[in-house]
Design a protein with these regions (language model features):
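N-terminal export signals
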Residues: 6-24
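N-terminal (or domain-start) structured segment
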Residues: 23-114, 177-202, 295, 323-326
Length: 326
């Protein structure tokens, strides 16, 4: 048996007070992991989360359960993760709409979008597009902005301060089209309903949920915000080639966790997730929604650096056009 003097010596050395990571946590993971989707079922975050979860579960040997925590434009679920224990059992599919665009446009946030998280890697990204109905008189972006110089042309977005809102404001200024009018909605779905009902002339939105209607011809894209034309839609020009390079952008999804995630867990996830993203069955699903991994995909410090740069750039845009979410 250990005598009192020996115990005191061990305590002074920190052996008793500070057990190692493996002793404190056991082999991670040893129970189910929750993967938080901060938007409702059916959207981009939910779709990607449910594609990733079973593959991640197989790689880690524990179940990975997608938990939808929507509300306040993604802030509720994201804030829940920020305040969760950093034990590897709560992960987040982070979204640029929260960590970049909300950070750029909101007067206050319940968390620091960088400091309160362990940001591991970008997963996929989706460009934005300008959509019109198939029977729209606007066949080109030039026709669209020319009309908006002399009469009201309405574009819908998923809400005030969203990436589509900011892109529309930039296009209006760059094209000198002052009557390009923003109509905000509580999400993309009601905006699409009004576009199809002819209540608005156009919509700016991530390509993800619009791929099928573009393919079947019910919607026409006038421009895409990707750096190059999309192989799946080679006839859709980029904003850059049409003279609007400042509109080149994308909405990314990433893998994040609460701040202070132990390094061995970070290393394990950094090892298993990138190969998962490259599996043929996932690449096909990502291609189906035109939401693909960047090449190369930034991770760790590079991912955080990308995030900081985007927050700074979009904060400047928001201030230029006085776009503030209270």
């Amino acid at each position: 048996m250990l005598n009192r003097r020996h115990l005191l010596g061990l305590a002074a050395a920190g052996v008793l007070a500070k057990p190692s990571l493996s002793l404190a946590q056991g082999a991670w993971p040893n129970r189910s992991i929750r993967l938080v989707a901060q938007f409702p079922p059916g959207g981009l975050v939910d779709t990607v989360s449910r594609l990733l979860a079973p593959q991640l579960a197989a790689a880690l040997g524990q179940s990975v359960v997608v938990e939808n925590r929507p509300g306040a434009g993604g802030l509720i679920g994201t804030d829940m993760v920020a305040k969760a224990p950093a034990d590897g059992y709560t992960l987040l599919v982070s979204h640029a709409s929260v960590h970049v665009y909300a950070a750029a446009t909101r007067q206050s946030m319940p968390f620091d979008p960088i400091a309160d998280f362990t940001h591991m890697m970008m997963l996929v990204e989706a460009p934005n597009i300008i959509l019109v109905r198939a029977d729209s008189p606007f066949q080109t972006l030039d026709q669209y902005v020319t009309a908006a110089r002399t009469r009201a042309v309405r574009f819908g977005s998923s809400g005030i301060g969203s990436a589509p809102h900011l892109l529309g404001a930039m296009l209006s200024a760059e094209a000198r089209a002052p009557q390009l009018d923003h109509i905000p909605y509580a999400g993309s779905a009601p905006a699409m309903q009004d576009l199809l009902a002819r209540n608005i002339e156009s919509m700016i939105d991530p390509i993800t949920t619009n791929v099928q209607q573009m393919r079947d011809g019910s919607l026409r894209a006038l421009a895409v915000s990707s750096p190059q034309r999309l192989p799946a839609f080679p006839n859709v020009p980029t904003f850059a080639e049409l003279g609007y390079p400042k509109l080149t952008s994308a909405q990314w999804l990433g893998l994040s966790a609460p701040k202070g995630l132990p390094a061995p867990i970070v290393e394990r996830l950094n090892a298993v997730v990138p190969p998962i993203l490259q599996r043929p069955e996932l690449m096909q699903r990502f291609s189906d929604i035109q939401t693909l991994p960047r090449n190369p995909n930034p991770s760790g410090a590079a991912f955080v650096s990308t995030m900081r740069e985007e927050i700074a750039a979009w904060t400047a845009v928001a201030r230029q056009f006085n776009i503030v979410v209270t």
